[in-house]
Amino acid sequence: MKTLIARHKAGEHIGICSVCSAHPLVIEAALAFDRNSTRKVLIEATSNQVNQFGGYTGMTPADFREFVFAIADKVGFARERIILGGDHLGPNCWQQENADAAMEKSVELVKAYVRAGFSKIHLDASMSCADDSIPLAPETVAERAAVLCLAAESVATDCQREQLNYVIGTEVPVPGGEASAIQSVHITQVEDAANTLRTHQKAFIARGLAEALTRVIAIVVQPGVEFDHSNIIHYQAQEAQALAQWIEKTKMVYEAHSTDYQTQTAYRELVRDHFAILKVGPALTFALREAIFALAQIEQELIAPENRSRCLAVIEEVMLDEPQYWKKYYRTGFNDSLLGIRYSLSDRIRYYWPHSRIKNSVETMMVNLEGVDIPLGMISQYLPKQFERIQSGELSAIPHQLIMDKIYDVLRAYRYGCAE
């Protein structure tokens, strides 16, 4: 990361896409996409997804590292080209507890990530806990971030410390996506970004972390990009020029969250304006979902009824029976809920792919389709971009390859934005 940031600060047009997903097919696609390049791939886990207690994936940071490395070995991607990051590391998971208890767990969270070899650490203590004021004072946020940084430094080996980088600050949306419809978004003001940096510098120095300050490579701000279930707020470069000019006076770049669904031109403009770390998550699993839905429609027409996976029906049954991951995000009317479950840009379905019933139905569908020849006309109908690549010899009509290429479509846009 340090080399990439240095190149960007030296005037090169270069950025990096941060892949925020724990889905094995998404991680496989991210690694396979850059297998034949010289680029490093940044893969991040969030604190609610992966933590010392397992998170919602059931994985600790060390488990997640081995999970990613196993996929890399399968793909033939060198482990040393992977950068592992931890996103929103702080009291995010424990906001219902008092601050002392939540911070105690947050300290252990950060230590677990660093011990596991994660080198990009987002120190985010911006969330109010049960006995806190709302919102937290910037000084309190910075002091808690310094406590987390001290925890990271205390367990890092000399070798790890050379690679260790920190990201500070937070964006407006909650981690995981907006819960309500959005019409506009508040762009971070320069004075707020400057205050974030100033308060963190003061808090770090007060705890003897002056050297660690040199490892702060980025600050999270809101550049004016966001999405909800059915709306996308697109980057307006002219609105972010004050931010772009301010960061040029520092040694840092910006990290932009929720950049999913922007245009490839917007990604290029974001990187030009020093939002050099672009985080993406739901757009990748949304592409995966589109591919699986397309293949399910193809299966419906090619496979005898008694052998079909019933993939789409199983997904809906499970999500309606177990609504905990979507009910506070989508409208409650039955038809609206079904539309949200299937097609929401927030892609809450991503939390359900590991469910045994859904996983088994997808596997059955894949086996069914691997045993037949999919007519080109059907691929043109349901996966038109992949049809074009089959025609040009870039792709084969194999279900797994079709899914990979659908995810590559998202990564292609980020490559256009980030490439030197």
UniProtKB/Swiss-Prot annotation:
<comment type="similarity">
    <text>Belongs to the GatZ/KbaZ family. GatZ subfamily.</text>
</comment>
<dbReference type="Pfam" id="PF08013">
    <property type="entry name" value="GatZ_KbaZ-like"/>
</dbReference>
<dbReference type="GO" id="GO:0019402">
    <property type="term" value="P:galactitol metabolic process"/>
</dbReference>
<dbReference type="InterPro" id="IPR012062">
    <property type="entry name" value="GatZ/KbaZ-like"/>
</dbReference>
<keyword id="KW-0298">Galactitol metabolism</keyword>
<comment type="function">
    <text>Component of the tagatose-1,6-bisphosphate aldolase GatYZ that is required for full activity and stability of the Y subunit. Could have a chaperone-like function for the proper and stable folding of GatY. When expressed alone, GatZ does not show any aldolase activity. Is involved in the catabolism of galactitol.</text>
</comment>
<dbReference type="GO" id="GO:0009401">
    <property type="term" value="P:phosphoenolpyruvate-dependent sugar phosphotransferase system"/>
</dbReference>
<comment type="pathway">
    <text>Carbohydrate metabolism; D-tagatose 6-phosphate degradation; D-glyceraldehyde 3-phosphate and glycerone phosphate from D-tagatose 6-phosphate: step 2/2.</text>
</comment>
<protein>
    <recommendedName>
        <fullName>D-tagatose-1,6-bisphosphate aldolase subunit GatZ</fullName>
    </recommendedName>
</protein>
<dbReference type="InterPro" id="IPR013785">
    <property type="entry name" value="Aldolase_TIM"/>
</dbReference>
<dbReference type="GO" id="GO:0005886">
    <property type="term" value="C:plasma membrane"/>
</dbReference>
<dbReference type="InterPro" id="IPR050303">
    <property type="entry name" value="GatZ_KbaZ_carbometab"/>
</dbReference>
<comment type="subunit">
    <text>Forms a complex with GatY.</text>
</comment>
<dbReference type="InterPro" id="IPR023436">
    <property type="entry name" value="TagBP_ald_GatZ"/>
</dbReference>
<dbReference type="GO" id="GO:2001059">
    <property type="term" value="P:D-tagatose 6-phosphate catabolic process"/>
</dbReference>
